[in-house]
Structure formats: C-alpha cells, structure tokens
Amino acid sequence: MDKLNRLEEHLGYKFKNKTLLKEALTHKSMKSSVNNERLEFLGDAVLDLIVGEYLFFKFKDTDEGNLSKLRAALVNEKSFASISSQIRLGDFLYLSAAEDNNNGRNKPSLVSDALEALMGAIYLESGLEAVKKIFINLLESQYNNIDLQSLGKDYKTTLQEITQARFGVTPRYELVSSSGPDHKKSFEMAVFLNDKELARAIGNSKKEAEQSAAWKVLQGMNI
C-alpha cells in the first residue's frame, strides 16, 4: 500500500477504507467488478456545491451571471486536470495495460474524472467539510488569482503567453495524422516552438488535440 500512502500524503488525508480509495482510482478499462464511475458521479455533484459556496462567499458583490461563469471556469475538465497534476494523480491510477500504453495517465479527461471520484470517496467517508478543506486548498494552490479575467484562458493561450514572454515566439500546431470514419474521427496534433516539437496529443477534433498538446507542455514545461 506504499503507493496509496504517497497519494494520501499529497492529499493530507488518510483513508480509513483503503478499498474505497482503490475504487476511486480504478478506471473502467480495468474491467474489474468495480470502477470509479459511480464515485465520479457523486464527486461531480459535491464539487459543484463546494465551488459554488466558495464563490458565493468570496465574491459578495458579484451577480449570479458572473458567479456562474466563475464556477464554469473552475468546475470543468481542464481545471480539474490541472489541479490533479499537483498531487500527481495520474501516477496512482489503476488502468488496463492498453490504456496505460495509450498515455492514459496524462489524459485530461481521465485524471479529471479520477479527481471527482477521489473527492466523492472522501465525501462518503468523512463528509462535506473534509472534502471542502482538501479541495479548496488544492484550488487556491493552483490559481493565484480567482477572477473572471485570469480564469478566462485556455491551455493554448497560457502556453502562448509564456513562450512569447520568454522567447518572443508563438507556438505552432501541425496535424500529424487523422483516423477513423468521418462521423468519429480522431486527430493527432503536434505543437512546435520554432522547429522543436514539444508534445503530441490525440483528440476528437483538431482543437481538442491542440489543447491537450498544450496541456502536456505546460505540465512538463518541456521547452
């Protein structure tokens, strides 16, 4: 259980029920009797409430429309994937060999779902306040400024700002390959800085693949 102990140290939370923790980390590709989809469903609802309450009290003079925009900027796949990187959540997941070989541990959708499942498991074991304490700490560590201006960015924009500030160069994205039928194509995009390839990623659209490639660069800052 050394692997799980390391994750608990990252979280600052000790699970009483290790089976529940393992369930939260088990992807459906494992084809086991349990996976983390039900806990993900629960965690999604819990985090929606926690972030909504957090914003309600933090921004006392902000109207409902802007509060909703702020919550949408924080409660989404990209945000949760970034937060997951703090605790290296992908390293602790139980995946099939095929999913692991397909870079599953670095897929934003997969680690985002696992974060929701993990928070759902903590909620079941210790209640709302425990989840709130852990998640808000992660949230505030990830985002120095929580406001509409700073949260309205995407991975490509963030990467471009960094490379322009450091090198005066804008990243370039190129299509590597595409596959599948017209109604269900997948695209592999590569991101370059000058002539150096920084990362590749696959998505259901070119835009999605570009975002995932930019995310990979930001996680490793492989520049």
Curated annotation (Swiss-Prot):
Binding site for Mg(2+): E40, D113, E116
GO cellular component, one term: cytoplasm
Active site: D44, E116
Pfam families per the UniProt record, alphabetical: dsrm, Ribonucleas_3_3
GO BP, one annotated term: tRNA processing
All residue ranges annotated as the RNase III domain in the record: 4-127
Location(s) in or outside the cell: Cytoplasm
Major site of localization recorded for this protein: cytoplasm
Reaction(s) catalysed (UniProt annotation): Endonucleolytic cleavage to 5'-phosphomonoester
EC numbers for this chain: 3.1.26.3
DRBM domain ranges (all copies): 154-223
Cofactor annotation: Mg(2+)
Assigned keywords, A-Z: Cytoplasm, Endonuclease, Hydrolase, Magnesium, Metal-binding, mRNA processing, Nuclease, RNA-binding, rRNA processing, rRNA-binding, tRNA processing
Keyword NAD annotated: no
GO MF: double-stranded RNA binding; metal ion binding; ribonuclease III activity; rRNA binding
Signal peptide per UniProt: none
Keyword Translocase carried by entry: no
UniProt xrefs under InterPro entries: dsRBD_dom, RNase_III, RNase_III_dom, RNase_III_sf
Top class in the EC scheme: hydrolase
Similarity comment: Belongs to the ribonuclease III family.
Known function: Digests double-stranded RNA. Involved in the processing of primary rRNA transcript to yield the immediate precursors to the large and small rRNAs (23S and 16S). Processes some mRNAs, and tRNAs when they are encoded in the rRNA operon. Processes pre-crRNA and tracrRNA of type II CRISPR loci if present in the organism.
Assembly behavior: Homodimer.
Name listed for the protein in its UniProt record: Ribonuclease 3
Organism taxonomic ancestry: Bacteria, Pseudomonadati, Campylobacterota, Epsilonproteobacteria, Campylobacterales
Gene name tied to this protein: rnc
